[in-house]
Swiss-Prot record:
Gene name, Swiss-Prot/TrEMBL: trmL
Gene Ontology cellular-component annotations: cytoplasm
Name of protein: tRNA (cytidine(34)-2'-O)-methyltransferase
Keyword Cytoplasm part of the UniProt annotation: yes
Lineage of producing organism: Bacteria, Pseudomonadati, Pseudomonadota, Alphaproteobacteria, Hyphomicrobiales
E.C. code: 2.1.1.207
Biological source species: Ancylobacter novellus (strain ATCC 8093 / DSM 506 / JCM 20403 / CCM 1077 / IAM 12100 / NBRC 12443 / NCIMB 10456)
Family listed: Belongs to the class IV-like SAM-binding methyltransferase superfamily. RNA methyltransferase TrmH family. TrmL subfamily.
Purpose of the protein: Methylates the ribose at the nucleotide 34 wobble position in the two leucyl isoacceptors tRNA(Leu)(CmAA) and tRNA(Leu)(cmnm5UmAA). Catalyzes the methyl transfer from S-adenosyl-L-methionine to the 2'-OH of the wobble nucleotide.
PANTHER family in alphabetical order: TRNA (CYTIDINE(34)-2'-O)-METHYLTRANSFERASE
Length: 158
């Protein structure tokens, strides 16, 4: 079991494809909680993921309920990245079995998902800034989680 990234009902294919490429390069899993705002596998998704999509481990869940059933059965902690988080991502103690959940680009996640999270983290931003692009935020959080857990590959570049 390894660190994983989950996208809650993603709106933008290119962001999801970019994150699929990131997890493929980092040896992680991507979970897509549907419905997505695009057909998974659409041209924008494939273009952003490039040929790395063949290497990506992507698991699709028909609903948040189905995702939660999987997560609880696996005994994994859900770490929600949110602008309402109380702990900065760099101050949070990640484990190698965490699932980091990113919300929809347009609306984040509903309150019920907030309540399901075991932890809520935030990327601190300058005053007046609302949020980062979800793909950038995901990459920053995964980088910190992998740094903390020693999860970066130790040999070569690919």
């Amino acid at each position: 079991m390894t660190l994983a990234l989950a996208l809650y009902e993603p709106d933008i294919a290119q962001n999801a494809g970019t994150l699929a490429r990131a997890v493929a390069c980092l040896g992680l899993e991507l979970h897509i909680v549907e419905p997505a705002g695009f057909p998974v596998g659409d041209a924008g998704f494939r273009r952003a993921g490039m040929d790395y999509l063949d290497r990506a481990v992507i698991r699709r869940h028909a609903s948040f309920k189905a995702f939660e059933e999987w997560r609880r059965a696996e005994g994994r902690r859900l770490v929600l990245a949110t602008t309402r988080g109380a702990v900065a991502h760099v101050d949070f103690a990640f484990t190698e079995t965490d699932v980091v959940l990113l919300g929809r680009e347009s609306a984040g996640v509903p309150e019920a998902v907030h309540e399901s999270a075991d932890a809520r983290i935030v990327i601190p931003l300058n005053e007046g800034a609302r949020s980062l692009n979800v793909a950038l935020a995901g990459a920053m959080i995964l980088g910190e989680a992998l740094r903390q857990t020693g999860g970066f590959a130790r040999t070569g570049t690919g």
